[in-house]
């Protein structure tokens, strides 16, 4: 996704009220962020930073290293790009305060081949075990990306099989209808009825700054103007001081 400099400049004057504290689970609970690619965590980045700041142990799990790109770098598809993106993921996770960043190593764009044999579920399930909360894409995958949808579906499959005493809260990140950033690149992103987005994680200016630092890590995926302005754009439009989630159950 690329965001034009003009759109970023147009939104620069917007101001956003920030809640004093972030909403989270009990201190020191485990939170797992299950997504498909390095950079997917950006769409809930200040929420991750808020949870980590409050003392939750956050693990970010990427199903693939993003070896297919395409991004904005000169790297061809393959292991060289994957290696750089793993480093970008670690940089981003560190900026957000995550305790652990894990890559499951499946091929970018090839997750469908690991659903029927159960290998994706088997690889992801141990990371979900013991978590109090799991954050992931909604069924829409943000903008319909097949890998995003599959990670959401497999994560849901894992969580719904757990008994009540072992089942973590499962939250789908969502964009409330009417709050999409006014950029052409996001015109086709899925939105959710605000009435369903009943869980929010509020963040502070420091958490947003951490999110901005995380975005700067993903050099292969976004031009500099987008990396510099993406979090501010999201803050001014679809977040406004808190990231919105739809409880799965």
Label every PLM stretch briefly.
Residues 15, 65, 105, 138, ...:
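Residues that line or immediately flank small-molecule/substrate-binding pockets and catalytic motifs
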Residues 6-15:
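Bacterial N-terminal signal peptides
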Residues 7, 70, 148:
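Functionally engaged cysteine thiol sites
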Residues 1-5:
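Positively charged n-region of N-terminal signal peptides that target proteins for export
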Residues 18-129, 156-165:
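Active-site rim/loop-helix segments in enzyme catalytic domains that contact anionic ligands
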Residues 18-34, 54, 115-249:
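Metal-dependent de-N-acetylase/amidase catalytic core
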